Amino acid sequence: MSSAMPDPVPPRLAERTADLLVERLAAFPTAVRAMVERLSPEEGRWRPSEDDWSIVEILGHLIDEETADFRDRLARLLDDPDAEWPAIDPVAAAAARNDRDRDLAELLASFEKARSESVSWLCQRLAQTPAVEWSLAKAHPRGDLAAGDLLASWAAHDLLHLRQIAKRLHEMLDAVGDPFRIGYAGEW
């Protein structure tokens, strides 16, 4: 077996990582909308088990993360690295708001609005923030967390939930497809 080195990072990515991450953040709502906008209310609320979130609960979580986690924490870190971050509990927040009974279209619109505000804020920050400030860091239970780490994690968080939505749709198709089977598509 060859021990080939991975391809080098494309120059565009290496030279303008923050800009590229903001572009990815801006594109995410379109991907989510394409996956969920035609779901019925029942499909949006469907869970494969009581321990799993439905798609509407995932959307509620994305709104929380948009407003109470990533944007808020990044702003606090850039403006006052020593400021404390409010605690967040995504599972408790979803339960307290009863996200499962919320309207999918309204949640999607709320998420798109919140993300648009975040992207506008990020574009303004990128225009005024020197690159060195992306290395500002804060002690965190998972280790020191730099502003750039938080920005990259925000974009990665989107992909985790895009995967989660795709999995939920796959599970739903498997559950409702009877008598038809989906095994020919391949393993999940």
Where are these regions (language model features)?
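Acidic/histidine-rich alpha-helical segments that form the ligand environment
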Residues: 24-28, 35, 91-133, 149-154
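Short, contiguous alpha-helical
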Residues: 2-4, 8, 44-90, 133-188
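Structural signal for well-ordered, non-membrane alpha-helices
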Residues: 29, 33-40, 67, 71, ...
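An N-terminal domain-cap segment
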Residues: 15-43
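Short amphipathic alpha-helical segments at helix-loop
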Residues: 10-17, 55, 96-103, 142-146
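Terminal targeting/low-complexity segments that flank the catalytic cores of oxidoreductases
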Residues: 1-25, 186-187
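Solvent-exposed interaction patches of small proteins and small membrane subunits
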Residues: 13-16, 20-23, 47, 79, ...
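Short gly/ser-rich anion-binding loops that grip negatively charged ligand groups
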Residues: 22, 60, 64, 108
